[in-house]
Amino acid sequence: MERQGAPLGPYRATKLWNEVTTSFRVGMPLRKHRQHLKKYSNCFTAVEAIDWLYDLLRSNSNFGPEVTRQQTIQLLRKFLKNHVIEDIKGRWGSESLDDNNQLFRFPATSPLKTFPQRHTEIKKTNTEYFSKDKDGIFKLRNLSQKTSKKRGLHFSQENTEKINHERITNEDLEIAPDNQEISQEDVEEVWRYVIMIYLQTILSLPSIEELLNPNQVIPQYIMYNMANTSKHGVVILQDKSDDLPHWVLSAMKCLANWPRSNDTNNLTYVGFERDVFKTIADYFLNLPEPLLTFEYYELFVNILVVCGYITVSDRTSGIHKIQDDPRSSKIHDLSNLNSFKSTECLLLSLLYKDKSNEELDSTKRLQRNDQGFQERCAKKMQLDNLRNRRASANDIMGGSCHNLIGLSNTNALSSNIKPRCSSLEGIVDRPVNSSEKKSSIFYQSVLNIEEQNSKQSLVSAPKQTPLFNLHSDENAQQPHCVGFNRTSALTVQDQEELCNEKYKSKQLCRSQSLLLRSSTRQNSCINKPVAEIIMKPNVGQGSTSELGESSTTINKRLCKSTIELSEKSLPPAASVLTGTQSLLQPHLERVAINALQLCCLLLPPPNRRKLQLLMRMISRMSQNVDMPKLHEQIGTRSLMINTFSRCVLCCAEEVDLDELLASRLVSFLMDHHQEILQVPTYLQAAVEKHLDYIKKGNVKNHGDGLVVPLPTYSYCKQISAKEFDEQKISTSQAAIAELLENIVRSKSLSLKEKRRKLKQKEYPLIYQKRFPTTESEAALFDDKPTIKQPMLNLRNPKLHSLRY
C-alpha cells in the first residue's frame, strides 16, 4: 500500500475498508494447497493471510507499527464475515477464523463498499430530499426496515389483515369523512406539532424542547409564511406599514442589480455606491431588534453548534448519522478487542496517530511557511489544556467585537479597564508614550500566533494582564451607546475613519458566551465553539516607528474557545478552524440547511421578508465582479458579513453574544439563502395528511388526536409457554385437517389416487373426526370394490385303478 495520509472527511472508515481490501486481494499470494488427499488451487491458509496482512498494516502509514497480530486476526474475521474471503468450501458470514492452516480463497464478487451518493437534485429541491422520510416520520420505523422472508412477510400479512378487518368493522364511521369539523385552534396545533416533529427528526434529538420551547412556535406566522409568497418565494405583506420603506427597497435594488439598475441619465458621482450602501446599512442597524429576533437567538446558534460538533454516540438515530473521528489512543488489551463488533470502529481504532505530525499539519494551516515559527507554535499548542486563560487581538477594522476572551479569574482584570456597554467588560485605555508607539504589546495565555518581520520588535507583557494592549491616542473617543444600536457594527464611514487614523485602535474585551444548556442525556455542557478569525491591523503610513516601516505585517488574531462534548472526549488544541473554513462539517451541511429552513418559518412575516431581501442583495453584491470596491482594504463579502451580522443575529443580553457565530451564520445564510428561505412543500403535505386523518373520524376527541395523531399498527403479542404449546398443536392439526379436506374434495384426483394419498398419512383422530361413521366414508367411496369371483373348482377325475 502506498504511504499516504489517513483519509479525511466523511465515510472515512469506508475509504479505509476499500483501500485495505483492494490491497489484500491484489497482493495476497495464492498457490496450491493439499487438504484431505485433495488439491486446491488459488487459495491460502489462515496463517499465510495473517502474516501477510500483519506486515501490510504495520508498513502502512495509516495504521503504523503498533498494530498487533490479534487485531489483524480480528480484521480477517471481518473479511470473512463480509465475504471478502471465504473458506475453501464457499462458506462465509461468520467469524470462524483462527491462526491455523484452514484454507481460504477469494470470491468472485468485489468486496468494495459503495459510498452514499448525493444527487444534484437534492441541492435544488427539498421535496426530493424528503421523498423517503416524509411519510416515514408518520410511520413506525421498523415497517420500513428489512425483515426476514419467513417472519417479516408473515407479520406484515397478519397486520394487514387486522387493519383491513378494523376498517371493515369501522366502515360506518368512515362513510361520511367530512362530518368531523376541525376548529382553527386544532389546525394551528397541527402546524405546531408537525414543524416541531420534523425539526426533531432532522436534528435527531430525543426532544426538541431542548432547543425550542413550544410556546415560541406561533402557527399563524408559519401559515402566513407558507401561503403568502411571490413567484420568487419572497413573503408578501398585507400590511404595508411593516414593509421596508420605498427608498430602502430602491437602494437595495440599485446595489443588487448594479450596474444594470444604474440609469446613465441620472447623475452619479464618485462614491455613489458607498453612500447607497451606507444608507441601507444604517436602516438595518437601527432596527429595534435583529431580523432573527431575540427569542430565537439560542435556537439558531445551537443548531450550528449541534450540527458542527456532534458525535456518533450522541446521534443514535435519525435520518442523518455521522461517523465519529476517534481521537483516543489505541488500546492493546486483548479483552477490549472483542468489543469491536463494528467493522468501522475496528478500522478507525487501527489508525496510526502521530501527534507531532498532527500538530505540525495544524500549524501549517494557521501560519505561513516559516519552519522555525511552526515548531515554536506547535510546542505552545501542547500547553492548551494546562492554561486556563486566553486572549485575542483587537479587530481594528470593524466596530464589532470578535474577540472571545475567557478569564478564569475575574480579578485578573486590571484597574485601567473602564466599563463601556453591557456587552463589553471593558476597554483598555492607557496613555501612549514614545516608547509604546514603537511597538505593540501582545500577550496570549493559550496560543500566541504572530508573524515577525526583521524590523519588528516584541515587548513582553506582564502576566497579570492577559489582554492585548493596542494603544490609542489620548484624544481617542469611546462612544457610549444605549439600546440595540450601541454595539452595532461600524458602517463604511466608520471603517474609513479607522483607516484614516481618526480612530487608531480600540480594545474590546468580553467574556465567552454559553451556547448550549446542559443536556440531560449527555450530563455535560456544550460550552463554546471552536473558531478562528484572521485580522489585518491598520498601520499608519506616516509613522516613523519600526512598525511603520513594516506596513505589510499581518497580525493574526486567534479567537478560540472549546466545546466540551463529553468528559471523556475532548477535541485537541490543534483542531481549530481557520478563518476560511466553514463552521459546519461537510457531511452535516444538509442537516443545517433543512433545520434552518424550518426555523426561518418561525419568524414573523415582516422579519422573514426583510431577511430574504437582505440575503438576496448581499449575495448578489458579493458575487458581482462589476461592483466597485466599497472599502479600500476589506473585500465586499467580508464587508457584508461584518456590517450586517449584528442586525441579523443578536441576543438580548449582549454579554452572551458570540459575534463570531453571528458572522458565521450570516456567511452560511449567504451561501445557501435560496434553499434556506424557500417554502418547504413537504411540510404542507404533511399537515394536510394529518388534518385529513382527523377529518375521517379516526380520532373522536381532538385533544386525543393531537397527542396521539398517528394510526396504530398491530404487532405480535407475547404469549406464555402454555399458550404457545396449545397454538402449536392446534395450528398443526388445523393444517392437517385442511390437507385432508383438499384431498377429499379434489376433483382432479381419481379414487385410486385419493386412497394412495390418504394411506400416506396416519392421523386417526383427525380422520375419525372427518369420517365419524362408515356411512360417511362410504359416501366418499361410493364405487364398491369388485370382489373377484373364486376360480371354479374342477373336480379331479377319479383314476380308475387298473387292477381289478
UniProtKB/Swiss-Prot annotation:
This is DEP domain-containing protein 1A. Gene3D superfamilies: Rho GTPase activation protein, Winged helix-like DNA-binding domain superfamily/Winged helix DNA-binding domain. Residues 24-108 form the DEP domain. Keywords: Coiled coil, GTPase activation, Nucleus, Phosphoprotein, Repressor, Transcription, Transcription regulation. GO terms for biological process: intracellular signal transduction; negative regulation of DNA-templated transcription. May be involved in transcriptional regulation as a transcriptional corepressor. The DEPDC1A-ZNF224 complex may play a critical role in bladder carcinogenesis by repressing the transcription of the A20 gene, leading to transport of NF-KB protein into the nucleus, resulting in suppression of apoptosis of bladder cancer cells. It comes from Mus musculus (Mouse). One of its GO terms (cellular component) is transcription repressor complex. Residues 282-322 form the Rho-GAP domain.
